[in-house]
């Protein structure tokens, strides 16, 4: 009986289907509703680098107060020519955080115990200055950095002090307590020194006397990191990178805000994805600001309006390097990438080693932001190597041995390359 009912039901369904009207096929292009709203962006693979120039100075991280410098000259494959101890290197509780600064044939360094040293180009010590105090005792606190302008050297310390030194003698001109920690270098331009504190505050000091001119705070808070982003200055405009992921544009002389932009987003599945800090120092090139976070975002921002030009789902460790239509970046996932500067599209990528033992994920390596010099791209790593790449294709060309491993970004001046090792040595290459 049941089988007859099933058969009749099936026949009825077939009858109804047969009686249905034919579906009208609407003409036009079919689009997949499941496709991403992010349209694919095409990258220009053509590469036109800036003209190679001999630069005499390297006054800030990435070369200048704007964190942009034109293509430095560097001939052949550099080899080590000398190395000298700068003081205390990396220790269990203390880390080197200051890149070498170069000006007027002097190389300035800061060790992990707040010792500042000036070297000449032959590696001889010119002077040393011990900046430890009751506020910054030895063997307990590290962090900070260096910046040069107007024959003086600005030093920030992890203890929250800003000290101005005579660059020729090392004499202390003044010191100021900002009442907060400082883990990143200062930015020094037009008679003003700007620092970022760990409490999401920017402080501008008059270089003549060390007095506070203005302060700015982020609207939100975030976790800081050692050697975090530093302000970028172009003319009378300062770009402030906060640990909250906010980027603020203000006037250098008054601190008056022009615009604010928050670089939102996080790297899913990574603990670093929750650290929103702008770790990719703002870089000012022409009418655009480039900045990246530790949580997987990189943005190009219009310098006048503060509106985003493009956003890339890639973080940045340290400043990007710009050369004409190319943007080179070390991402938060330890990948070296070349992007199209105009739209952020990827041209090539190179996976840098992360672990000494990849199978067990032990012995973690770190790498520092790329530097373009002499038509080659250089990346220094804690794995005791400086990698040399073809900037057009991303091909690994050479490996330069680096005793002690890298503890800073490379600095280049007068066709020489300088770097700090984890053992606390300044090493020169040519």
Range-by-range predicted roles:
Residues 120-124, 166-169, 206-210, 252-255, ...:
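Short loop/turn segments that connect beta-strands within beta-propeller blades
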Residues 328-341, 345-388:
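Loop/turn-rich, solvent-exposed surfaces of beta-rich toroidal or solenoidal domains
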Residues 111-112, 150, 157-158, 197-198, ...:
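Structural signature of WD-repeat beta-propellers
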Residues 27-38, 45-81:
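Blade/loop signatures of beta-propeller domains
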Residues 19-22:
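Bacterial signal peptide processing site
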Residues 55-56, 104-105, 150-151, 190-191, ...:
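Short coil/turn segments that connect the beta-strands within blades of beta-propeller domains
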Residues 82-101, 128-147, 174-189, 212-234, ...:
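Extracytoplasmic beta-rich repeat domains
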């Amino acid at each position: 009986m049941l089988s007859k009912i099933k058969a009749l039901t099936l026949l009825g369904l077939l009858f109804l289907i047969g009686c249905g009207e034919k579906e009208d096929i609407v003409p036009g292009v079919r689009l997949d509703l499941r496709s991403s709203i992010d349209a694919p962006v095409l990258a220009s693979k053509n590469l036109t680098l800036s003209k190679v120039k001999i630069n005499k100075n390297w006054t800030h991280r990435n070369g200048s107060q704007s964190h942009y410098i034109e293509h430095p000259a560097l001939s052949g494959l550099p080899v080590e020519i000398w190395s000298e101890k700068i003081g205390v290197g990396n220790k269990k509780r203390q880390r080197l955080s200051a890149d070498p600064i170069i000006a007027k044939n002097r190389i300035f360094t800061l060790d992990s115990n707040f010792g500042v040293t000036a070297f000449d180009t032959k590696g001889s010590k010119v002077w040393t200055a011990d900046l430890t105090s009751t506020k910054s005792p030895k063997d307990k606190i590290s962090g900070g950095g260096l910046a040069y302008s107007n024959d003086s050297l600005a030093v920030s310390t992890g203890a929250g002090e800003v000290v101005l030194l005579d660059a020729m003698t090392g004499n202390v001109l003044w010191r100021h307590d900002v009442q907060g920690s400082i883990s990143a270098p200062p930015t020094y331009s037009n008679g003003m020194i700007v620092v970022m504190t760990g409490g999401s505050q920017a402080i501008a000091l008059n270089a003549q006397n060390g007095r506070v001119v203005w302060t700015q705070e982020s609207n939100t808070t975030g976790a800081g990191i050692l050697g975090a982003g530093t302000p970028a200055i172009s003319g009378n405009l300062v770009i402030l990178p906060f640990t909250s992921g906010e980027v603020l544009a203000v006037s250098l002389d008054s601190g008056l805000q022009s615009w604010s932009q928050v670089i939102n987003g996080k790297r899913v599945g990574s603990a670093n994805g929750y650290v929103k800090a702008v770790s990719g120092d703002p870089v000012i090139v022409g009418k655009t600001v480039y900045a990246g976070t530790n949580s997987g975002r990189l943005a190009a921002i219009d310098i006048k309006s503060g509106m985003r030009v493009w956003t890339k789902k890639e973080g940045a460790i340290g400043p990007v390097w710009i050369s004409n239509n190319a943007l080179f970046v070390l991402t938060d996932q330890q990948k070296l990438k070349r992007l199209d500067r105009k739209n952020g599209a990827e041209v090539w990528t190179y996976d840098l080693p992360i672990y000494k033992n990849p199978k067990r994920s032990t012995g973690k390596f770190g790498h520092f932001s790329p530097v373009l010099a002499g038509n080659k791209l250089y990346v220094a790593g804690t794995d005791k190597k400086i990698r040399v790449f073809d900037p057009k294709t991303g091909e690994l060309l050479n490996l330069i041995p680096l005793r002690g491993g890298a503890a800073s970004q490379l600095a280049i001046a007068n066709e020489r390359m300088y770097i700090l090792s984890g053992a606390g040595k300044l090493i020169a290459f040519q």
